């Protein structure tokens, strides 16, 4: 633990090798700060800023996954009103699931902006370019092991099982 104002459930590392439940192993880019913009909730709510944005808070909650990246265009899932795309990112309602997420679009041992939260389900999100017309929150990492690669175009998340 360093003095970088991080949550007590988090370890600041450059390389993330998280294998425990409920205790995400995080690197030096995502720290807790109550006066910043974004939130990282280590159960079911994960809010990711882009690679160079360090505005993240840590809370325990079971709500949504919120991905923010300036490269995302305004999009919206057709069949799930809880999944809203906007210019800065998209909100993905993902209950009862804890995922491995590498926001820097690489494997979790190499880059400095990886958020790892292994708990119950093992889903790897490598990249943030998602294109889907049918994806729903219940289809993401719900009792299945799924991997999303960078620039992967997804037409049906159920096929990634």
Curated annotation (Swiss-Prot):
Compositionally biased intervals (Low complexity): 84-126
Region (Disordered): 1-67, 80-147
Biased amino acid composition, Polar residues: 135-147
Protein name per its UniProtKB record: Putative uncharacterized protein DDB_G0282281
